[in-house]
Amino acid sequence: MGVLGGDAHVPIGSQVSPGSVVVTNNESFGHRKLLKGVDFLVRIKAFAFCLAVIVLLKNNVQTTVIAPGIVLQAKYNNTKAPVSLLVLASICCGYAFLQAVVSLLSFIRDKRVLNNTVLAWLTFLLDQVLTYLLLGSAAATAEAAYIAKRGEDKVQWKAVCGPFKRFCDHFAATVFLSFIAVIAFAVSAAISAYYLFRRSKGFK
């Protein structure tokens, strides 16, 4: 015979110390649903920010006439850093979308889709690798944007944002969104690490 407390049965003879908390099945279910919901939202945001970076970079072109007969054009591929960022953002965008779909299915079914230790490790490693690669690429692009705006006296590189203000403004927005995408990927990596830790403890 026992006393029913929520979904948990506590024997009458058992002692529960003051301040102790009994975790019920409903609480565990709610925690899982919340975590899966957060995982989906973070991954879909990572997808959206990476997509915004791609669109901004591809469409960031400005042509300026600096003198009669002299026309200059600024494009994202004038330097290597934005090109690398575009390639990496495209990879991250596709990966984030696939993971968002998997996360949404897990949320709907209330169980992990592709529930496998090898895949859990693969997700964890890919989250980590892509986060650091995206961070490095965003930092390199930020440096290129800074030099374009301020110049570099030591190597006699002149600032170019004077005649290309719109281009530089869009470039700055791209860098900002890139770092927001990095934050979203970092949170996703933390969640996948938590899932891997739970699996190592015998939880699904």
Swiss-Prot record:
Gene Ontology CC: one annotated term: plasma membrane
Pfam families: CASP_dom
Quaternary structure annotation from Swiss-Prot or TrEMBL: Homodimer and heterodimers.
Record's subcellular location: Cell membrane
PANTHER family for the chain: CASP-LIKE PROTEIN 2C1-RELATED, CASP-LIKE PROTEIN 4A4
Keyword Membrane listed: yes
InterPro entries given in the database record: CASP/CASPL, CASP_dom
Transmembrane segments: 37-57, 85-105, 118-138, 171-191
Protein name in UniProt: CASP-like protein 2U1
Coiled-coil segments: none
Extracellular side: 58-84, 139-170
Organism: Selaginella moellendorffii
Topological category with respect to the lipid bilayer: Multi-pass membrane protein
Glycosylation sites: N77
Side Cytoplasmic, residues: 1-36, 106-117, 192-204
Keywords: Cell membrane, Glycoprotein, Membrane, Transmembrane, Transmembrane helix
Protein family membership: Belongs to the Casparian strip membrane proteins (CASP) family.
